[in-house]
Amino acid sequence: MADEATNPNTNGPGSGILRQILNLEDAILIEPQLHAVTPAQHAARDAADAVRRLIRGLESTSAPIDQLANLTAELDRLTRTLTEDLPATTSSEKSTVTYQAHRLRERSPFIGQANPVALPLVMEFVEGGIDAVANFSSLYEGPPGCLHGGYIAGIFDEVLGAAQTFSGHAGMTGRLTIHYRSPTPLNTDLHLRARLESVSGRKIMCKGTLHAGDRLCAEAEGLFISVDPKKLLGFISS
């Protein structure tokens, strides 16, 4: 079957197809106003913010050994308090769209607001794809003053994976190709653009760019393979 470019106007965030197949994206990005943040979620996000501040402090600290030892003991105590007698999530709970939407929105390693190690990435659905902004500190340094290439690959996988939902199908990454064009600076607003390119059977192709100001830092192509959402949720719960 020949590749056919998908019309974003028929498969955009407002389409019934996308809403039926990808309720996760509805919950996370498309209609956040329909998903009020609960007091428990606010508390978890505040705690995650506090841990992020701690991580940033540890990354740059020159505190003496005894102070670090006391900090370690206190963190161990807090960890025990936090993890004692926590109920396990059942397989049936994991297999629901509601659970997975909450997991991605709150705990995703890329956009999870309650995940203290989530990357500083903010995505927005636009016509035909995704626009995103990220700003990385020295925590993510690879070459001196520059973002590590592994994080560049990771954020491309995230934004291209979101853009492929405009095909009207749920796809998983089959191949990700990164072209590193120039060093990507730290402590700078980075602008990512991801667009759906074509659909051929189960194959969904997307392309993206990463800029720091006017400078092109990287480009990417992603091949995604569409998967039945029910089968995917079944796999997650197994």
Residue ranges of predicted features:
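Long amphipathic N-terminal alpha/beta scaffold segment
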Residues: 65-141
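Alpha-helix N-cap/helix-initiation motif
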Residues: 144-145, 149, 183
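HotDog/MaoC-like acyl-thioester-processing domains
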Residues: 2-93, 184-186, 197-238
